Amino acid sequence: METKVGKQKKRSVDSNDDVSKERRPKRAAACRNFKEKPLRISDKSETVEAKKEQNVVEEIVAIQLTSSLESNDDPRPNRRLTDFVLHNSDGVPQPVEMLELGDIFLEGVVLPLGDDKNEEKGVRFQSFGRVENWNISGYEDGSPGIWISTALADYDCRKPASKYKKIYDYFFEKACACVEVFKSLSKNPDTSLDELLAAVARSMSGSKIFSSGGAIQEFVISQGEFIYNQLAGLDETAKNHETCFVENSVLVSLRDHESSKIHKALSNVALRIDESQLVKSDHLVDGAEAEDVRYAKLIQEEEYRISMERSRNKRSSTTSASNKFYIKINEHEIANDYPLPSYYKNTKEETDELLLFEPGYEVDTRDLPCRTLHNWALYNSDSRMISLEVLPMRPCAEIDVTVFGSGVVAEDDGSGFCLDDSESSTSTQSNVHDGMNIFLSQIKEWMIEFGAEMIFVTLRTDMAWYRLGKPSKQYAPWFETVMKTVRVAISIFNMLMRESRVAKLSYANVIKRLCGLEENDKAYISSKLLDVERYVVVHGQIILQLFEEYPDKDIKRCPFVTGLASKMQDIHHTKWIIKRKKKILQKGKNLNPRAGLAHVVTRMKPMQATTTRLVNRIWGEFYSIYSPEVPSEAIHEVEEEEIEEDEEEDENEEDDIEEEAVEVQKSHTPKKSRGNSEDMEIKWNGEILGETSDGEPLYGRALVGGETVAVGSAVILEVDDPDETPAIYFVEFMFESSDQCKMLHGKLLQRGSETVIGTAANERELFLTNECLTVHLKDIKGTVSLDIRSRPWGHQYRKENLVVDKLDRARAEERKANGLPTEYYCKSLYSPERGGFFSLPRNDIGLGSGFCSSCKIKEEEEERSKTKLNISKTGVFSNGIEYYNGDFVYVLPNYITKDGLKKGTSRRTTLKCGRNVGLKAFVVCQLLDVIVLEESRKASNASFQVKLTRFYRPEDISEEKAYASDIQELYYSHDTYILPPEALQGKCEVRKKNDMPLCREYPILDHIFFCEVFYDSSTGYLKQFPANMKLKFSTIKDETLLREKKGKGVETGTSSGILMKPDEVPKEMRLATLDIFAGCGGLSHGLEKAGVSNTKWAIEYEEPAGHAFKQNHPEATVFVDNCNVILRAIMEKCGDVDDCVSTVEAAELVAKLDENQKSTLPLPGQADFISGGPPCQGFSGMNRFSDGSWSKVQCEMILAFLSFADYFRPKYFLLENVKKFVTYNKGRTFQLTMASLLEIGYQVRFGILEAGTYGVSQPRKRVIIWAASPEEVLPEWPEPMHVFDNPGSKISLPRGLHYDTVRNTKFGAPFRSITVRDTIGDLPLVENGESKINKEYRTTPVSWFQKKIRGNMSVLTDHICKGLNELNLIRCKKIPKRPGADWRDLPDENVTLSNGLVEKLRPLALSKTAKNHNEWKGLYGRLDWQGNLPISITDPQPMGKVGMCFHPEQDRIITVRECARSQGFPDSYEFSGTTKHKHRQIGNAVPPPLAFALGRKLKEALYLKSSLQHQS
């Protein structure tokens, strides 16, 4: 029996039928005889216009126009029908079954049957028919189809018109019920009626018409006779069918079943579906049954349909009401579940919450700061303990309950309540909490977030959100009820998830199952049904909120939720109106009963930043202009965008498909100017100054339309694009061409708004660029006033410059008010190709000599981009590098293949996500010869290839060999390759081992290798060099090394005769450095190791981190204090209080500093270098500044950091931060930072670097901003040395450009990546929760990295780790010890804990939500020995943001020392405080190898300046 929709054969039209006699609807124009009246379709009508329906009157016309996909062997037309209505002769919509009692007609859109995707061929008809019969198909497929037949064709009903939808949908559900009963009885004819109804209800549970499975069952019973007749009709058309529906006892029982509430449907139409014959429905009507009875039955069914619709609307209104109102929980109803009344007592002094925050502003609740509250308690205005439940779980207006709280506030540490912990304690806390005792203002709402196996409870005041840690012992009994209710909700989740259909469990079913829980179950309430139901209803708001947050839609809308909401509605409690607006006004008074008690001043308040007036003005003026009110929805969207950009959680942000990483998207194409059609007088004004290189006369001045244009001035040129502002160009020189045209050559002066600083730029400042062009003087539209500005540099000139700038701004404002032209100034060169702003090349601009430095740069770039032979054809130029025979070179690895010559491809190999497995370093080769192809020898641009011999690396042999070998070791071979010159990627050195630098340090920044072994690739064996083989090694060019070799390393030429490392510089010759936001000192350590910095002062707010800094930098003066206070103290000491913008609190704290502290403060002129990374609180996903309010931005520490730079005016300034710093707050913070440094007078360079490419085994992108005084040289970016797969370092620039700081190393780098085994493979075994600080190594270091990171250490410190709770430890042991294993590899089984509780080994919550969260990859994950460690965070845990934290072979979380090594800290580096403090110090640190690489480039810049000065 073929019943598939669209393939069922239909009956053909009998040629003897007199279709001309059929009844027609009143609106239709009848065509009486199709046979006698030929159909003529005009040429215009033959083609249906795309997306435009044709309207026709005759059915036959519609059939002909939609015949494009008609099957020739189908005797009867089949069509699709959409947007249709079945109506009577008066045009009134009618149910399909009404066909039994009268004539039914059709209107709609007819389409070809087989062309589902093509809706352009539809033909609309107003009305035709009549409808002869209808039938249901799709029984075998399980997908019902409704077919309607007229005398001419059969129509597959797809989509009804909107006005007909409700009527048709009801009939379609009847068809669905028929198909589901057919499916169930075909599988099991002997099933019971209850089982049949349950099966059908499960299958139809997705329907929006029914509220629950019970409603579906009632509907199926009401349609019993209808269903019986349809299936009985199948017996007649499918006689060989194994199931006999007519005599099936269950189907007969369904037909005869009487419902006390709903009258049976009375349609006894049986349809026969046959390939050869269809029986009309009216043939099956029992003639004995009176027509009025049949009509009454149909009317009754229509009333039933309408009643169902009303019920559905009522449910919808109930749901809508639940979104408008919050049902208040009365305290007396839940009193039995709580302890007897008790009062809050605390002898400790508590600080008013309002002192930590600044009240009085309208803020969005989503922008409030988030803190953690430990050791907390809640109470009312009488200090009586009170439950959280009396508070709303949604923001409500005018709540009539007052709840306050107290506790120890600390920075948000992600605390939560572990569901596996029987004591309702957090899994991430110690008993001692750092923070301060406070009392809260009125609590307005609270929420529960359900995250896998952690519960996060958060409450909100008007000042902040507080994530709750462990409650106080006094309050713990009041909180236990809340946690128990959470466990009840989670138990219900588990019940529902175990069902194949969640609709199977009604509210009553769930209550019964809760009664059956064992007494030792954490969700056990009672065995009595009434007690359980009372508990669930009175605590229903907690349960409903958890269901609302659950990601599974079916569970969210399950019958249990509907039933519980209905029960809560029936209680008739007070309803609070839910607030739609998220904005709140922070009040300035705290009504907490503890407000009358004495309190202390807090150090934790986010103090308004202490700033200089210059920085305050720049940021304040910007926010006075660009702080429009942003709708809360828009703010939310911005936040979501920024969260998605957070590279800290994603190791594979984008797929770069370029084979060669491009440093920057260059653009030297100048703006095209538009010629001037006006006639104006143009003549030279002055004598000839000289000639161009082409012999054309040069002039210094010209008169253009009465205006004087001079070399060194600025002119306006209109551009082709009318939407762009006119371009301003700096005049380099003017000349008269050979065809007597007066010409000008100039460089583009870019407006600040068109640079990376955007709207933060000063509208009067222009930036010189390297974009130049030559135009006719007649194209000039005018001149502008331009001042090539120069200011004396240094802290001693700061006040003088401020006065001059103030007068300049006043003059500009006056000119603007009087409508006078803008006077521009220029003091910097903007180079997007180099990612920065540089001092003007004053010696090369405005000379009028015919020379243009920009043209020279373009010529050099074009020359570098060429690949060509040298003149003697014995060498190669490629990418600006000249290669000669005998040179050691880098080759892209995808050019070296087993089958010889094969051009590289940009297609990326399949890699394990984020682990660098599969990435290869450059292949080191020696250039043997340049082969010029024979056919191109005579051509000027001859084609050529290079012949190379290959060196193998240890990793080419095996993983074990790579692990145990020096990363700079190579093996010579006889393998040769002939490759295109594009494969070459640079030069390196290969030396004998005893010619290597004596002091090789980590990280490696030199391209030097050594070779002393031969590798036979044919046998795979390593051998000593054959006696007859002569390998020409690199020549040693390092004079220091030559002296060392000659003197055997005893002396290096110093007068003292003390042995000194080649790169070591005495501290007195280094830059005196002030490290702000110093942390434990990772940045300072790397810079000092590079030999460029001497950290004399450090400022760190957190005491444990400050102590760690002091331990590792004992000579530095460390201020463990707020940097705002320190800056205020310095400015007071120097007598510059008038220039200091700070709070009264900062001044009071300065007064409390002792004289010893004040005497050690750094002063302007003493610090050559300021470095640091401002806290990221403002740049994280949860911040209080995203609304752009200036009053809130003033608390950003970035302002204080920039003010240090302004006040001290050091030679160099370095800012480090997370990648998101560039995009935070729509990029405004980044732009204002750049604008501030430029306004101070600095040269500025910006970029993003990946620490993993500098020798650490973890991905860690950092934004770096360098600033150098106008007299210094800006450091270049360090070259990435290790392959690492973590792209995403591009910074977007205006005009469609982007800046790539350094090349991407995914396709090759000088060295391989550092692996997990390299990093931690030598560390001894430790157990879960290890706390012993000092240990023995027990083994010798194996890898090159281990040898460097250990140094001379004999005692291993801080190889300690956090402890896993019992369940997580069991899970850890069950995670397979193989690469990439995580929670998905856990067996699906239960485990019994020591307390007797039975828990699921595989977290159910993860299993059910995996599809929406990238499979929760990495949670409970094991590290891969050959991969990299995850991003170092402040609190590693298996359910954290970086869940891959299990050791590759041991059953524990990675230790403090292992995390430190992943950041590149040497084993000698000490950390301070608890295990948690140490993880925090490491997670917040700058990787020392990255700092070392930056320091080396800074040292090069200093040497370059010294060299330039020596030359001059």
Curated annotation (Swiss-Prot):
The active site is at 1176. Residues 1-35, 634-678 are annotated as: Disordered. InterPro entries: BAH_dom, BAH_sf, C5-Methyltransferase, C5_DNA_meth_AS, C5_MeTfrase, C5_meth_CS, Cytosine_MeTrfase1_RFD, DNMT1-like. Residues 1-22 have a biased composition (Basic and acidic residues). Maintains chromatin CpG methylation that plays a role in genomic imprinting, regulation of embryogenesis and seed viability. Required for proper patterns of CG DNA methylation in dividing cells. It catalyses: a 2'-deoxycytidine in DNA + S-adenosyl-L-methionine = a 5-methyl-2'-deoxycytidine in DNA + S-adenosyl-L-homocysteine + H(+). Belongs to the class I-like SAM-binding methyltransferase superfamily. C5-methyltransferase family. It is found in: Nucleus. Its EC number is 2.1.1.37. PROSITE patterns: BAH, C5_MTASE_1, C5_MTASE_2, SAM_MT_C5. Residues 707-841, 909-1026 form the BAH domain. This is DNA (cytosine-5)-methyltransferase 2. GO terms for cellular component: nucleus. Keywords: Chromatin regulator, DNA-binding, Methyltransferase, Nucleus, Repeat, S-adenosyl-L-methionine, Transferase. GO terms for molecular function: chromatin binding; DNA (cytosine-5-)-methyltransferase activity; DNA binding. Expressed at low levels in vegetative and floral organs. GO terms for biological process: DNA methylation-dependent constitutive heterochromatin formation; methylation. PANTHER family: CYTOSINE-SPECIFIC METHYLTRANSFERASE (PTHR10629), DNA (CYTOSINE-5)-METHYLTRANSFERASE 1 (PTHR10629:SF52). It comes from Arabidopsis thaliana. Residues 638-662 have a biased composition (Acidic residues). Residues 1071-1505 form the SAM-dependent MTase C5-type domain. The gene is MET2.
